[in-house]
């Protein structure tokens, strides 16, 4: 091959390589453009690990979904009409409880970024159920988790995440600064109630759709506190119960009626010798029933029921199947406070069905361990200790904690009745275990009129963590 032929051959090869390279670059540009068009153009594509954020604009829901793709957030929107959660239906007839969620927050938090929390509770709109919780401004297995056994601090905040997920900075939404809280949905937007401030002058901040709409000042200057579970909404109005005063003596109790986040009416209960704290409230046939904690002198639970005009009735669950902790062994009940082992207590709940009652309680009579559901067909009004159903939820050898009620409205379930549900806090760490922190995970169950099973669904995290050693 002479020199001219070599030059022509080499030039031809270079030209072919250049053309191929140019075609590859053009193909790459087209591929990137098509991929970007698909990501930004598809308004209805479901992606895993989406975070849905609901905003309220001109009486129309806008469901904003931030889809994480290659560390870039692309915003998609679709309008969802608001409704009114009527709350006029009766509780659904049930025969037992089906497991609904379990977040395993402590187990996941040994290696992942999970908030140190307490007082978790669940509330549902007509679109979704969310877990609300009070953080300590710290993560598990981190130095700031030290000393988080304390109930009230300026670092505590109310946050929420999708039900069943471990609460982390990546899936959680800030709601309010609070060391005591409640939240509920009226069919249009979320109402949150967050109490913070000094013990002798705390203030409850009400937010509607994330915007401050009202405040409630402590009226007895003695640790204003509220439910630590969902408020209850009927026909566009939402209701909550607050306490102000001693935790071991006569205190003051008020019911508040709120509309679009503003207090429109309140009434103070005339309840001498009663003690109401941390009420678990639910709607039933257009009225509200709350079952609460007596931290003063009752090992059975006090209740208050009221209509939308705040006309109320009060009493104690009469059953000899006692619902508080600590408590005596089951025996003869009373429609007033049962005094033996009546001091102190734990947040709890019950569901009234006529003269009968579903009672949720710890299995242990003197520690926050184990959990069970008991059906006493005459327990709301009768004082004997007989019952017909017991369903195991957590074994007595495993820790439990607070528990509370929530409901699923027909607008969510498609049923013609209000489904009763409950959650159980599974407390881990101090003061019972050798850690520097106190936190918890949670489980939840909903009532069904079909097959169910009793078992134990414990937290089951292996302690201590690295930070504790």
From Swiss-Prot:
Q: How is it modified after translation?
A: N-glycosylated.
EC assignment: the record states: 3.2.1.18
Entry cofactors: Ca(2+)
A biological process from GO: carbohydrate metabolic process
Summarizing activity control, the record says: Inhibited by the neuraminidase inhibitors zanamivir (Relenza) and oseltamivir (Tamiflu). These drugs interfere with the release of progeny virus from infected cells and are effective against all influenza strains. Resistance to neuraminidase inhibitors is quite rare.
- Top-tier EC class: hydrolase
Which residues does the record list as glycosylated?
A: 50, 58, 63, 68, 88, 146, 235
Q: Which residues bind Ca(2+)?
A: 294, 298, 324
For this protein, the record's InterPro entries field holds: Glyco_hydro_34, Sialidase_Influenza_A/B, Sialidase_sf
The positions annotated for binding substrate are 118, 152, 277-278, 293, 368
- How does this chain sit within the bilayer? Single-pass type II membrane protein
Residue spans crossing the bilayer: 7-27
Cell compartments where the protein resides: Virion membrane; Host apical cell membrane
Gene3D superfamilies assigned: 2.120.10.10
Give the main localization category: virion
Q: Which residues lie on this side of the membrane: Intravirion?
A: 1-6
Q: What positions constitute the catalytic site?
A: 151 (proton donor/acceptor), 402 (nucleophile)
Give the intrachain disulfide bonds.
Answer: 92-417, 124-129, 184-231, 233-238, 279-292, 281-290, 318-335, 421-446
Q: Where is this region: Involved in apical transport and lipid raft association?
A: 11-33
Q: Where is this region: Head of neuraminidase?
A: 91-469
**Entry's family note:** Belongs to the glycosyl hydrolase 34 family.
Function noted in UniProt: Catalyzes the removal of terminal sialic acid residues from viral and cellular glycoconjugates. Cleaves off the terminal sialic acids on the glycosylated HA during virus budding to facilitate virus release. Additionally helps virus spread through the circulation by further removing sialic acids from the cell surface. These cleavages prevent self-aggregation and ensure the efficient spread of the progeny virus from cell to cell. Otherwise, infection would be limited to one round of replication.
Q: Subunit comment for this entry?
A: Homotetramer.
Name listed for the protein in its UniProt record: Neuraminidase
Species whose genome carries this gene: Influenza A virus (strain A/Goose/Guangdong/1/1996 H5N1 genotype Gs/Gd)
């Amino acid at each position: 091959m002479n020199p001219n032929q070599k030059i022509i051959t080499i030039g031809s090869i270079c030209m072919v390589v250049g053309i191929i390279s140019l075609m590859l670059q053009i193909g790459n540009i087209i591929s990137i453009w098509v991929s970007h068009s698909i990501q930004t153009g598809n308004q209805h594509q479901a992606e895993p690990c989406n975070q849905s954020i609901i905003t309220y604009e001109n009486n129309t829901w806008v469901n904003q979904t931030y889809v994480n793709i290659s560390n870039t957030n692309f915003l998609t929107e679709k309008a969802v009409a608001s409704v009114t959660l009527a709350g006029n239906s009766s509780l659904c007839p049930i025969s037992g409880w089906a497991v609904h969620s379990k977040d395993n927050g402590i187990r996941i938090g040994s290696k992942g970024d999970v908030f140190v929390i307490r007082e978790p509770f669940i509330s549902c709109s007509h679109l979704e159920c969310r877990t609300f919780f009070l953080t300590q401004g710290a993560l598990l297995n981190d130095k700031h988790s030290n000393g988080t056994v304390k109930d009230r601090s300026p670092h505590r905040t109310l946050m929420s995440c999708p039900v069943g997920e471990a609460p982390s900075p990546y899936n959680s939404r800030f709601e309010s600064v609070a060391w005591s809280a409640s939240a509920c949905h009226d069919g249009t937007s979320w109402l949150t109630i967050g109490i913070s401030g000094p013990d002798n002058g705390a203030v409850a901040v009400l937010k509607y759709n994330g915007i401050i709409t009202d405040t409630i000042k402590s009226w007895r200057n003695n640790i204003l506190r509220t439910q630590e579970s969902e408020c209850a909404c009927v026909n566009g109005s939402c209701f909550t119960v607050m306490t102000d005063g001693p935790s071991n003596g006569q205190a003051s109790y008020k019911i508040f009626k709120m509309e679009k986040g503003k207090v429109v009416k309140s009434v103070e209960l005339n309840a001498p010798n009663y003690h109401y704290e941390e009420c678990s409230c639910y709607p039933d046939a257009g009225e509200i029933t709350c079952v609460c904690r007596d931290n003063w002198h009752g090992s059975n639970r006090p209740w208050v029921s009221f209509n939308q005009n705040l006309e109320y009735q009060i009493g104690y669950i009469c059953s000899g199947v006692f619902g508080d902790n600590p408590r005596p062994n089951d025996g003869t009940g009373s429609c007033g406070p049962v005094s033996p082992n009546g001091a102190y207590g734990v947040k709890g709940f019950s569901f009234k069905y006529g003269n009968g009652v579903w009672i949720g309680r710890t299995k242990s009579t003197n520690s926050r361990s184990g959990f069970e559901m008991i059906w006493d067909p005459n327990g709301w009004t009768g004082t004997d200790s007989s019952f017909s159903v017991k369903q195991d939820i957590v074994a007595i050898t495993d820790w439990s904690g607070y528990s509370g009620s929530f409901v699923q409205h027909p607008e969510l379930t498609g049923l013609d009745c209000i489904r009763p549900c409950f959650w159980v806090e599974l407390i881990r760490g101090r003061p019972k275990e050798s850690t520097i922190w106190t936190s918890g995970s949670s489980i939840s169950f909903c009532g069904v009129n079909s097959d169910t099973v009793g078992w134990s669904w414990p937290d089951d995290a292996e302690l201590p963590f690295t930070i504790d050693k």
